Each structure stands twice: as structure tokens, then as C-alpha cells.
């Protein structure tokens, strides 16, 4: 694993893997001998443990993601498929706008590596120094586009360099990232494609059909490239580690400095595209650093950055945003982006509560805006496609929000009509509903509650379990591979149930995690899953 390297790595992370652990990680992540050339997801993670035969749920995702020997919880992306047949819209626009006179030949043909054309995929996403013409889709972007991107990359590099001068403790790590080639147009181009092809992993806040690296706020461009670089390094397709904790912290400061400036000017992301892009960048940084195995970074995100972003969203009214009838495509994109930024802020807050016992600052009750829309609507690449897909589907029926969903699933009554309404939620919706339940789990474990409260929550988890199989089965088989981290939601529900059942028991006294004390070392949660996660999941509450 190469992500998030730092000058003094041993002092920043839980511990460095020993020889045995390194060997185990190597065989787990790279069963295919020719991993640098192989892009077949079936050749990855072939040594994962088989599902238990006694009906218990395999918690391999939670164990892998929380394992402190990994530098990022996003290590699980190594097992994700890649949407190799797709090309981002800005690359298509570049190709369309590059015209050549009749009878002339594009000179880039003369520089092609013809051997690589025989492969389905480029040999190495990061091999730009040795073969800068082999990358994705054969053609590079037009010179004008490269020049614009190069100028933007240089601007970012210079800005962060100036910030590092005033932060001497961050300068060495930042210089290492520069020396390794992070701030190059070729790296940005390659990582943008890489992230685009794995955009399904997290439920995306980026609207890729209209995303343009030449025009988007440089703060957002930086956050996207940092996230894509983490993905790249989790697959070990990078010749060296581009990322250092110094680069991440400087980037985080840069993005939140701009956010504060806009808030001070009373700018609102509901009407300002630039501020919305800054909020997108903030969400990406919260997700990225919250997932990193860096204790201080995770503490900073949980205690400082997420609260700052939440305050901004509350002030702007983004948390309660809904779609309007007969929205134009442009209006839809902006409002749906607002909805997704609020949703992922809520999710990050929930995950900090689950993994770190960090008290959540948002409530499901205040989340009165729409749940994110279906991906087929979100990924419409034109106004015509949007209108065709959005008809009868954009204005949501009950339950349309986190607030309605969690109130309904916790309710005493669970009528046939309610069951039918909740049965229309798709797998992604249930992923969001799970995030709402995590706040109740935290409250149940850490506060004085009535004896009925744990039973109510167990009943809600059972209802969720009854909804998931049908929602999953409705997904076409070929599309299930694009479900991303949402496909692991049953594991979160299972460990939540186990935590509730342990409340007040003698066993609970042996678990550091169940003491409810905030800790930003994932080893504590990892040990809890190891110790209690594989217990029988029988004895569910009555619906």
C-alpha cells in the first residue's frame, strides 16, 4: 500500500505492517502475477474468506476497511470493477473540437504506441514519463486544453507552496509530493480518467457529464485528483506514492479557507455555482481524510471540518432542498448536487459515529430535503435524456427524505401500505437510510435511554433487513457490480444489531469500543468487529 505516505510514517499511523502482514496484504490485493497489466477485476481479491455456512453474514468489508495496517479505508476499491468502455464528457468534447483539414493526418498518430492499441486497457495509468501517448482512448487532449490544465496545475502548486512556507512542519512532505510528480498535467489527466471510471464506488457528488477540468473551481479539481490518486495507489498502480499527509492537510486548509471567505461574504451554494463546487471539494476532503488511517487527520475532520461544513449547509438551507416540478436540466443539476452534498455530509458524520464513536452533529429530523435521485437520472448526458428519464421519477413519493424514512422505519406501526411504500426504495436509498439509523445506534449505546429504545431500534434493523433482498434483486445482474460501497450496507446493519444486543452485558465491558469513548484509531472498531462481529445473528426482533 502506497497511499498517504509521510516523512515519518511510523509516528503518524497506528503501526507499520510487519513482514507477515505485508505478505498477507500482497497476496490479498494482487493474486494476479501480472497486476500491472491485468485489468480483470475477477483476478483481484481471490483470497477473500468464504461466506460462513451457518447463515451468518461475512463482515469482510468492515474488517478490511477498519484494519489499521491499511493506509486508507478505501483499500476495498481494489476489488471494484472499472468502467473501461466509458469516456468522460470533457474528453469527448476535446475530440469533437479538434478539427483537421481534409487530406491531413493528425500528427499524434505518428506518436502512438501501436503495441498498446492491441490491449483493452493501457498498461499502466501512471507511466506517463516513459510513454505519455499511450493513455486512455489513444488520443491525448488538444494542446490548448493541455495548456489550460497545465496552467491550473501550476497555480495550485504555487498556491500550496506559498501556504507551506508559513507552515514549516508541512513543507517537507509537500516538497516530496512535488518531487514525485503530483503537480503535473499528465498526472491530473490520468487520475481524472481513473476516478471517472470508478465513480460508482462512492455515491458521487460530481456531475460527470458536465464536469470540465478546465472550468471547474481549482479547489474542486484538486479534491477530485487527490481522491483519484488515493484510488490509484490503493490498486498499487502508482510507481511511487504521490500523497503525503502534508499535501492533504495543506489542500484541506486551502479548500476550507475559500469556504470561510465565501461564508463571510454571505454567499450561498444554493445560488452560487462556485460556492457549491467548494462545498463539493470539502465533502471529498472529509471523505478522503476521514477514510485515511491517520489519527490526527481523522480527528480534525470529525471535530472541525465536518461541523464547519454542516453550519454552512444549515445556513444556506441546503439540508431541506427538494426538486421542483418541471425543472430544466441545468436547474436539476445544481439542486441535485446540493442534495448530494448534504447527503454525503450526513453520511460522513454518521460514519464517524460508527467507526470512531464521534458524537454526530446532524440529525435525521433536520434532513427534510430529498434523498438523492436515481443514478440513471443523475448520469443523463443531455437535456433530452434527462427529460426522458426524469418524467414521473424526479418528484419522490413517501418516504422522500431521511426524516420521513427514519421516522417510518422506527414507527410502532408497520402497515402493509407502509411496507409497500418502503419496498419501492432502491439499494442506494437503503444505504442512506442506514446512515440515519447509525445516529440512533450511537444514542442507544452512549446515552441513558428507555428500555423500549433498543427494542425499537432492533425492530427497525429487522425491517431494513426485510427490504434489502428485494431491492437488491431488482437491480439488473450486470448493474450490481456498480453498486459500490452501498453493497456492504448489510454488514453495517449486522454489526449495529450486535452492538445493541451487547448493551449492558458483561461482554460489553471487555470491549474498548463499547465504552462509547471517541477514538480516531480504527484499531478499536476493528477489534470490536473481530471479537463480536461473527456471533450468530439469530433472534431478531418481531416486526
Predicted regions and their residues:
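Intrinsically disordered, low-complexity activation-like regions
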Residues: 30-227, 250-268, 280-295, 299, ...
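Short functional micro-motifs and their immediate structural scaffolds
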Residues: 11-14, 25, 31, 110-111
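Cys/His-coordinated zinc-binding microdomains
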Residues: 7-10, 21, 33-36
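Specific register positions within alpha-helical solenoid repeats of the TPR/Sel1-like families, i.e.
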Residues: 229, 233, 290, 438, ...
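Cys2His2 zinc-finger metal-binding sites
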Residues: 3-6, 20, 26
Amino acid at each position: 500500500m502506497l497511499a498517504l505516505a509521510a516523512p515519518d510514517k511510523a509516528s503518524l499511523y497506528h503501526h507499520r505492517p510487519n513482514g507477515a502482514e505485508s505478505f498477507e496484504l500482497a497476496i490479498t490485493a494482487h493474486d494476479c502475477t501480472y497486476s500491472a497489466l491485468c485489468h480483470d477485476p475477477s483476478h483481484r481479491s481471490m483470497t477473500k474468506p468464504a461466506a460462513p455456512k451457518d447463515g451468518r453474514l461475512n463482515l469482510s468489508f468492515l474488517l478490511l476497511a477498519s484494519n489499521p495496517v491499511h493506509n486508507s479505508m478505501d483499500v476495498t476499491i481494489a476489488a471494484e470493477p472499472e468502467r473501461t468502455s466509458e469516456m468522460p464528457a470533457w474528453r469527448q468534447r476535446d475530440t469533437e473540437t479538434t478539427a483537421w483539414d481534409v487530406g491531413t493526418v493528425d500528427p499524434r498518430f505518428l506518436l502512438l504506441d501501436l503495441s498498446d492499441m492491441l490491449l483493452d486497457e493501457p498498461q499502466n495509468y501512471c507511466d506517463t514519463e516513459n510513454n505519455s501517448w499511450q493513455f486512455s482512448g489513444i488520443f491525448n487532449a488538444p494542446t490548448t486544453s493541455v495548456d489550460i490544465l497545465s496552467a491550473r496545475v501550476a497555480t495550485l502548486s504555487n498556491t500550496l507552496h506559498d501556504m507551506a512556507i508559513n507552515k514549516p512542519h508541512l513543507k517537507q512532505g509537500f516538497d516530496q509530493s512535488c518531487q514525485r510528480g503530483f503537480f503535473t498535467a499528465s498526472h491530473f489527466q490520468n487520475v481524472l480518467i481513473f476516478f471517472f471510471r470508478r465513480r460508482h464506488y462512492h455515491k458521487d457528488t460530481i456531475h460527470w457529464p458536465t464536469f470540465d477540468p478546465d472550468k471547474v473551481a481549482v479547489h474542486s479539481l484538486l479534491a477530485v485528483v487527490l481522491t483519484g490518486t488515493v484510488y490509484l495507489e490503493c490498486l498499487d498502480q502508482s510507481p511511487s506514492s504521490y500523497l503525503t499527509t502534508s499535501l492533504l492537510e495543506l489542500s484541506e486548509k486551502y479548500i476550507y479557507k475559500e469556504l470561510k471567505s465565501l461564508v463571510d461574504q454571505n454567499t450561498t451554494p444554493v445560488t452560487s455555482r462556485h460556492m457549491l463546487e467548494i462545498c463539493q471539494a470539502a465533502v471529498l476532503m472529509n471523505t478522503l481524510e476521514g477514510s485515511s488511517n491517520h489519527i490526527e487527520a481523522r480527528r480534525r475532520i470529525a471535530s472541525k471540518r465536518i461541523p464547519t461544513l454542516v453550519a454552512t449547509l444549515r445556513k444556506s438551507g441546503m439540508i431541506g432542498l427538494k426538486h421542483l416540478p418541471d425543472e430544466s436540466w441545468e436547474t436539476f443539476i445544481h439542486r441535485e448536487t446540493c442534495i448530494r452534498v448534504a447527503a454525503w455530509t450526513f453520511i460522513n458524520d454518521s460514519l464517524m459515529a460508527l467507526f470512531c464513536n464521534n458524537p454526530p452533529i446532524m440529525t435525521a429530523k433536520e434532513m427534510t430535503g430529498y434523498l438523492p435521485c436515481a443514478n440513471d437520472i443523475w448520469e443523463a448526458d443531455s437535456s433530452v435524456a434527462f427529460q426522458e428519464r426524469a418524467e414521473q421519477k424526479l418528484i419522490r413519493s413517501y418516504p422522500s427524505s431521511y426524516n420521513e424514512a427514519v421516522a417510518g422505519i422506527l414507527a410502532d406501526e408497520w402497515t402493509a401500505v407502509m411496507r409497500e411504500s418502503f419496498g419501492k426504495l432502491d439499494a442506494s436509498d437503503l444505504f442512506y437510510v442506514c446512515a440515519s439509523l447509525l445516529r440512533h445506534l450511537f444514542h442507544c449505546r452512549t446515552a441513558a435511554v428507555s428500555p423500549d429504545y433498543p427494542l425499537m431500534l432492533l425492530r427497525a434493523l429487522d425491517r431494513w433487513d426485510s427490504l434489502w433482498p428485494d431491492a437488491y434483486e431488482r437491480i439488473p445482474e450486470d448493474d450490481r457490480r456498480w453498486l459500490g460501497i452501498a453493497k456492504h450496507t448489510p454488514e453495517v446493519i449486522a454489526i449495529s444489531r450486535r452492538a445493541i444486543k451487547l448493551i449492558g452485558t458483561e461482554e460489553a465491558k471487555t470491549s474498548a469500543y463499547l465504552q462509547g469513548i471517541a477514538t480516531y484509531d480504527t484499531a478499536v472498531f476493528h477489534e470490536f468487529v473481530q471479537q463480536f462481529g461473527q456471533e450468530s445473528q439469530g433472534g431478531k426482533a418481531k416486526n
